[in-house]
Amino acid sequence: DEKISRQIGGQADTSPNFPKAKWDKFTPKLGLRYQYTEDMMVFGTLSRGFRSGGFNGRVGGGLEEATQPYDPETVDNVEFGIKSEWLDNRVRLNASAFLMKFDEKQEELKLPNSGGATGQKTVVVNAAEATITGLEVELQAQVSDALYVRANVGLLDAEYDSFKYTGSDGNAVDLSDRDFRRAPDVTMNIDATYSWDLGGGEAWVRGSVRYLGKHFIDNENTTELANGAQTIVDMSVNYRVDALTFSLFGRNLTDEDGYT
């Protein structure tokens, strides 16, 4: 049948340029916990993460560039910390420290199109070796039946040990020792919720203050595009009765501006 033969023939793809690749990786994980007391536990974790390689698909460099795969990314992670409860479980204090080592880190870059094409292309390259170290502390407290408070602090050092690639113009680009984009050295947050009974339902007010240290928004760490320290305040007023909930929100009440 001619119609059937057309359908079958139309589904065949004999293109010699159809790219194929396969990646696999052993990703072990080891975790240890020790219950020091009934209310305190310490833990440690060793693990390896894996992100598969792939293809960039359509890019401005043409078919040859689009069919060249980028390699997988691996990260080795070490973390240890403590989890604890105090004052009859009304206060919870947790802390952890971690170290992450990236190998063949995949980076998404926006580059000028090559081969005479106009505009930009977005490509993924294995450009970087990187290290992240950090410390996180979290406190939760049921101060009273009506008041709940939560706070956390994060310290982060996220830096590229080696970040080199070839630009579309053929020149070498070296971003080694630059900071990760959108990775403030210091972050802090505190939020509180106060609730009470009202008119057969429940009312509550929630407010939060969030602090972000100075950070860059691009891989090049362009000073003119850096965000300075930011303090962002949010608040909401809420009322729930039966199956209905009414809320009034206020976002970024300090009117902080920044690059995204």
Predicted regions and their residues:
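Membrane-embedded beta-barrel scaffold of Gram-negative outer-membrane proteins
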Residues: 35, 42-43, 69-135, 142, ...
